[in-house]
Amino acid sequence: KNEKSKTGNDWVAQMAIDWEAAADQFKKLTSRIVKMRISLLISKNFSLVKYSILSTKFGITPIIGSKHNTINWIHIDDAAIFIKESITHKKYQGTFNISTQNPISQHNFIKIIQKKVCPFALSIQIPEFLLKFILGKRYSIINVKLKLSANKLVNTGFKYKYNKMEEALENIINQ
């Protein structure tokens, strides 16, 4: 899904629509607006990463929802670099999916964490109905099956420090 694709109708999509409409109000004041659709940030403080690593150290790795769900992601360092560059370089204008070109399934995400932290950890799937009950509308944040396109970002010449999940998690685990 790229920046020009039709938006969804769930809670997250509506939040993005509202935020981008608010950003458009600044067109009267400036000639350049950058709208960032930031995918899941990979950082040591990001809950999914933090708790997946912690629980894996204890021998259990939770699979949140379906193991086939897609994680569109970007390392926090790369997101910070883009934000800085988007302020200082006029080549950035319009809407950008701030994501790597390498989305990953939950299953592969868990396998990487287990490989790096505890290869013998047991994977336990948390049922979707339980997550829907606990999280309500916010469940749509983690129940993702679409892959974002980062082509517009890449076509600007943006260079990732971490374009592979293995490298990103290695960096986080070693912090």
Where are these regions (language model features)?
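Glycine/proline-rich active-site loop of Rossmann-fold NAD(P)-dependent oxidoreductases
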Residues: 17, 29-31, 42-51, 86-96
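Catalytic helix-loop patch of NAD(P)-dependent Rossmann-fold dehydrogenases
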Residues: 1-36
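Glycine-rich "substrate-gating" loop/helix at the edge of Rossmann-like oxidoreductase active sites
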Residues: 6-12, 38-46, 66-76
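Amphipathic terminal alpha-helices
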Residues: 163-175
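Mid/C-terminal beta-alpha module of Rossmann-like enzyme folds, strongest
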Residues: 86-137, 173
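Alpha-helical substrate-binding/gating segment
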Residues: 53-61, 68-103
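Non-catalytic, hydrophobic alpha-helical segments
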Residues: 79, 83, 98, 109, ...
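Conserved C-terminal active-site "lid" loop/helix of NAD(P)H-dependent oxidoreductases
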Residues: 106-111, 132-159
